[in-house]
């Protein structure tokens, strides 16, 4: 008995650290002519396995619905079908959708209604912005940080740190699919989430619900995409280069579109319709930067030369060469996400999600403009492995269990081995 109580306490305390990843749909269905409630009317979310029926009062409720835009269909024998298009489900929110059905003597008649997004959310108790995947696609940005800086109350410092309402970067809580994802070392996000992978982005500032127990100034809650019953794919790319005639910026006169590019692709669809779906994506990004130094000397004080032995030492008859320009603020990165959703039984959903990313970069150092070889390189690696299990107990309650492992590794060095002989001047 004591063991059971301990497990229950752990689950209750653990729930405080979980962010919302699903929404709720509810409403009342009546006969348009008589105003009487419709008992047993079917409510179906099209192209999904979600559905329910109305009770004796014409009321219905559906829980645990992933956030996105849906078409909701009301149908009942003896009435025209009523299809509501553009219904938006939001994480941690209740979407109210009522319906008035018209009696029909011809089977198959249908009425289509286009829903509109409410300008005011009456159940919101804090300052928040909710950005859907459709809105993200229309923004001229490629990083989550660029989306955040467009929101009210959010500022970005020179190092890229996110501040909300004047607080510190470590006071912002990041969550991915309801799981805390903040890096305990610097307060940033532990893994890189690409905009293409986000189904819904919530930016909350001010007061918070109890589920965000560790947040002080703000919460960034990201819900990643799931696969559906139809195959979908996308490819996004851009390429370019920095150009300037200002002599302050060296070596920006020649155009080379391979110096700055990004390629991302995604594919989703069914493995077994209505039972198993997948979502997979990847991105490669590179930039040689816009700040260049004239590489003139080696780390040992020699004039640059052809390092035929690749040891950075001037050996034997190796020939000296003219100084050359080299990037001082470059970066190169890749990331991938793979997610599989299982629906083995009605009301039971399993989700397995993996996110991997790696980044190499150098930061600009004014003192090393002529000695770029002495500049250290930064290495970032992030990994997220998550398992989510949810089960709907009744129209008004469900259970959810999240198990995850998150790793974030940051290193910065000139040579990987601290005992490397090249750290010593020959």
Please tell me what each predicted stretch does.
Residues 19-110, 114:
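Periplasm-facing N-terminal accessory domains of Gram-negative outer-membrane beta-barrel systems
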Residues 80, 85-96, 110-210, 214-219, ...:
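Periplasmic N-terminal accessory/gating domains of Gram-negative outer-membrane beta-barrel systems
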Residues 128, 132, 251-254, 294-310, ...:
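Flexible, surface-exposed loop regions and adjacent strand-edge segments
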Residues 200-207, 218-221, 228-269, 282, ...:
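Short strand-turn segments of transmembrane beta-barrel domains in outer membranes
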């Amino acid at each position: 008995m004591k063991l059971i109580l301990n497990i229950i306490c752990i689950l209750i305390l653990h729930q405080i650290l979980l962010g919302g990843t699903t929404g709720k749909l509810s409403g009342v269905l009546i006969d348009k002519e008589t105003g009487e409630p419709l008992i047993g009317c079917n409510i179906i979310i099209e192209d999904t396995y979600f559905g329910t029926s109305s009770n004796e009062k014409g009321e219905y409720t559906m829980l645990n619905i992933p956030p996105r835009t849906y078409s909701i269909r009301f149908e009942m024998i003896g009435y025209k079908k009523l299809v509501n298009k553009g219904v938006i489900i939001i994480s941690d929110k209740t979407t109210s959708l009522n319906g008035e059905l018209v009696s029909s003597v011809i089977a198959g008649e249908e009425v289509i209604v286009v829903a509109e997004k409410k300008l005011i959310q009456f159940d919101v108790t804090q300052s928040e912005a909710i950005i859907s995947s459709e809105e993200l696609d229309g923004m001229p940005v490629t990083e989550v940080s660029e989306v955040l800086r467009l929101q009210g109350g959010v500022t970005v410092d020179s190092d890229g740190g996110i501040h909300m309402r004047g607080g510190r970067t470590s006071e912002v809580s990041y969550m991915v699919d309801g799981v805390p994802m903040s890096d305990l070392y610097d307060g940033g996000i532990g893994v890189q989430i690409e905009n293409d992978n986000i189904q819904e982005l919530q930016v909350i500032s001010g007061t918070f619900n109890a589920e965000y127990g560790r947040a002080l100034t703000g919460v960034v809650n990201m819900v990643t995409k799931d696969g559906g019953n139809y195959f979908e794919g996308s490819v996004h790319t851009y390429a370019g280069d920095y150009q300037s005639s200002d002599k302050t910026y060296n070596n920006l006169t020649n155009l080379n579109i391979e110096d700055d590019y990004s390629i991302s692709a995604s594919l989703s669809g069914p493995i077994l319709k209505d039972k198993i779906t997948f979502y997979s994506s990847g991105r490669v990004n590179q930039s040689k930067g816009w700040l260049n130094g004239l590489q003139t000397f080696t780390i040992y004080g020699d004039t640059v030369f052809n390092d035929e032995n690749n040891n950075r030492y001037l050996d034997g008859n190796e020939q000296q060469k003219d100084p050359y320009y080299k990037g001082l603020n470059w970066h190169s990165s890749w990331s991938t996400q793979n997610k599989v959703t299982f629906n083995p039984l009605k009301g039971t959903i399993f989700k397995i999600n993996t996110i991997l990313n790696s980044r190499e970069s150098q930061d600009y150092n004014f003192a090393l403009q002529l000695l770029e070889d002495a500049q250290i390189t930064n290495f970032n690696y992030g990994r997220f492995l998550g398992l989510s299990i949810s089960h709907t107990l009744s129209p008004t309650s469900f259970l959810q269990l999240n198990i995850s492992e998150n790793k974030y590794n940051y290193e910065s060095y000139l040579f990987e081995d601290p005992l490397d002989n090249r750290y010593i001047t020959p």
